[in-house]
Amino acid sequence: MSFISRSTTTFRRSISMKDYARVRWYSNSGKSLIENILSSKIAISKVYTLKKRIGLPESYPMKVLVQALIDKTVVQNPQYSNEKLWSIGKVFGDFYVLEYIKCKYPRLPEEAVHGMQNGWMGSKALSQLATIWGLEVQRREEGLQESFGKVLAKRADPEMLRKPGEIYKDEAARRAILAILGGVYLHQGFNDTKKFINDHILSKQLDPRTMLQLQWPRRQLSRLCKRLSLKEPVYRIIAETGRKSREPVFVIGAYSGHHLLGQGQASSLNLAEQQAAYNSLISYYIHSPPFRQLPSDYLEVNDGKIPKASEPYTSIPLVSHGQLVI
């Protein structure tokens, strides 16, 4: 987030203190920090409550969950922080979410794909998920006993610029969630990792239409038809009423040859044509072919062996460039 490094005083003062979270180096080692948490009844009860709240199985080690809540900049030794867990969780999270988007919306432009991926795996999205889980960032005035069960990070003064060794609230929450995800993969396996992502991350509803930049729909539809070797789109009136009244309604269809690409309804011919072109583009780009299995379903490994699938893998059906499915 490069904008945080701006030095304008007005900009720095306009951001609330709660939007920052800075990590300080703890004097005690990471090992003793984890041992203190595991040996405290208050601490272990809070961590266990979090474990049950997010649906982790009993076989998920408490030590790993505690370690996932200690950010990598809190302790110098990565063996006792969530640095390695976070790295593993990020790799599998990005891989599976990107695979899901590519299979569900194969025609979606790359900008929209990155937008949806950020909507599920970005700092803001995972920070909201942390709020749903009940995760909090440790406050500056809290002691170690009160911080058990929270992400170990402290708020920073908004007048201070970001320095090495500092992170912010959203990033701290994101690292903690991805570290928990990495622990799921290490101790539960690939199948449970995918289930965890489906239950907690992909369960958030995202509309792919909001990711598309369609500022000039008629021009963009014309270029799309040319790229797909289709006839130039023509706009025809399908129905109308009240042309000479105060509230006319026009229904316009966008045609490529004899094929209806889409239709729009508005109070003027120009707006109706724009809406018809927009709906045609939306229908093309968010086309979602049905599929039963993802390619990663055939990467499941049990005891070092890849089991035979119950049915042969069929690739995601893609429509050829000469067709338009509306």
Curated annotation (Swiss-Prot):
<dbReference type="GO" id="GO:0032543">
    <property type="term" value="P:mitochondrial translation"/>
</dbReference>
<feature type="domain" description="DRBM">
    <location>
        <begin position="216"/>
        <end position="286"/>
    </location>
</feature>
<dbReference type="GO" id="GO:0003735">
    <property type="term" value="F:structural constituent of ribosome"/>
</dbReference>
<dbReference type="Pfam" id="PF00636">
    <property type="entry name" value="Ribonuclease_3"/>
</dbReference>
<dbReference type="InterPro" id="IPR044443">
    <property type="entry name" value="Ribosomal_mL44_DSRM_fung"/>
</dbReference>
<dbReference type="InterPro" id="IPR014720">
    <property type="entry name" value="dsRBD_dom"/>
</dbReference>
<keyword id="KW-0689">Ribosomal protein</keyword>
<comment type="subunit">
    <text>Component of the mitochondrial large ribosomal subunit (mt-LSU). Mature yeast 74S mitochondrial ribosomes consist of a small (37S) and a large (54S) subunit. The 37S small subunit contains a 15S ribosomal RNA (15S mt-rRNA) and at least 32 different proteins. The 54S large subunit contains a 21S rRNA (21S mt-rRNA) and at least 45 different proteins. mL44 forms a heterodimer with mL57 and stabilizes rRNA expansion segments 1/2 at a membrane-facing protuberance close to the point of attachment of the ribosome to the translocon in the membrane.</text>
</comment>
<comment type="function">
    <text>Component of the mitochondrial ribosome (mitoribosome), a dedicated translation machinery responsible for the synthesis of mitochondrial genome-encoded proteins, including at least some of the essential transmembrane subunits of the mitochondrial respiratory chain. The mitoribosomes are attached to the mitochondrial inner membrane and translation products are cotranslationally integrated into the membrane.</text>
</comment>
<protein>
    <recommendedName>
        <fullName>Large ribosomal subunit protein mL44</fullName>
    </recommendedName>
</protein>
<dbReference type="GO" id="GO:0003725">
    <property type="term" value="F:double-stranded RNA binding"/>
</dbReference>
<feature type="domain" description="RNase III">
    <location>
        <begin position="47"/>
        <end position="189"/>
    </location>
</feature>
<dbReference type="InterPro" id="IPR036389">
    <property type="entry name" value="RNase_III_sf"/>
</dbReference>
<dbReference type="GO" id="GO:0004525">
    <property type="term" value="F:ribonuclease III activity"/>
</dbReference>
<keyword id="KW-0694">RNA-binding</keyword>
<feature type="transit peptide" description="Mitochondrion">
    <location>
        <begin position="1"/>
        <end position="26"/>
    </location>
</feature>
<keyword id="KW-0809">Transit peptide</keyword>
<dbReference type="GO" id="GO:0005739">
    <property type="term" value="C:mitochondrion"/>
</dbReference>
<comment type="similarity">
    <text>Belongs to the ribonuclease III family. Mitochondrion-specific ribosomal protein mL44 subfamily.</text>
</comment>
<dbReference type="InterPro" id="IPR000999">
    <property type="entry name" value="RNase_III_dom"/>
</dbReference>
<dbReference type="GO" id="GO:0006396">
    <property type="term" value="P:RNA processing"/>
</dbReference>
<dbReference type="GO" id="GO:0005762">
    <property type="term" value="C:mitochondrial large ribosomal subunit"/>
</dbReference>
<keyword id="KW-0687">Ribonucleoprotein</keyword>
<dbReference type="GO" id="GO:0005737">
    <property type="term" value="C:cytoplasm"/>
</dbReference>
<dbReference type="Pfam" id="PF00035">
    <property type="entry name" value="dsrm"/>
</dbReference>
<keyword id="KW-0496">Mitochondrion</keyword>
